[in-house]
Amino acid sequence: MKFLIKFFALASILFSFGVFADGHQKTIMLSTKGPGAGNPFWASVEAGAKDAAAEFGVNLVILSPPQESDVMAQVAQIEDQIAKGVDGIAIAPTDPNAVAPILDDAIASGVPVVYIDTNGINEGVTFIGTNNINGAALAAKYICDNVPAGSDVAILQGMITQTTGQHRAEGSNKGLTECGLNIVAELPANWDTAQGMSVTEDILTGNPNIKAIFASNDNMGLGAIQALKNADMLSDVIVVGFDANPDAAASVAAGEMSATIAQFSYNMGYMGVENALKLANGETIPDNIDTGTVLVTAENAADFM
């Protein structure tokens, strides 16, 4: 993706910083919510992590549960890597509360942890990712600027057990309400395309005058678009997604999805490995590292395809 910004140090520093600071090659675990295969967002996170591992000479272990709801699988994977002597963990927690005890165990045993994409509850752990409240507010502003005041609108929520889902729901609700729009439905579709379509179908049945839908990720947004196509309503309703995955950017360029919010998933993976490695080498890092957001419309969609 053309728009992504990589954060690289000088090559002469990387060798000593990245690999052999205490005489052995570091192993960093990247623990994501789902496999990159079939999911452009996680594929981009993995690509960033792999590039960082190659740049810094790190042994990278990428693991994820088979489904995003399979919290215990993620916990078991972390337990296994701690037992194998992993040097650091960069994790996107499936459920921050459920994974907190095993992460506390990791930290207590000397294994540093950083969060990527989704913040957690463990004290003193750095978060690397998007300010999701601000990103959702940016999506809400686009909707406010493009539909009449007082219009009916809906929000497709992600998993509300995750801070990402909570913050996108919060930012979108606040933004849409403050500009005078009428939120007729706020329903979870759990980041899933098929659920996005079925939930949108239900919303359309009860709210035929709806003018806009904010989908908390692109998968749900693409599902909403399919539901609108099936109902012959796509020309009457704007859909704004979140992630700017290549398929969503293509939809924006084609005039189907109206807009999406880009978050820099590649950098989450890259900086997750980079900063877990810094901690493993005894360095300090900031408490929060914001990877940024930008509005993607037809004017700049090609940059994300």
Describe the function of each predicted region.
Residues F3-L4, F17, A21-M305:
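A residue-level marker of the well-folded mature domains of exported/periplasmic proteins
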Residues A9-F17:
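Hydrophobic alpha-helical targeting segments used for export or membrane insertion
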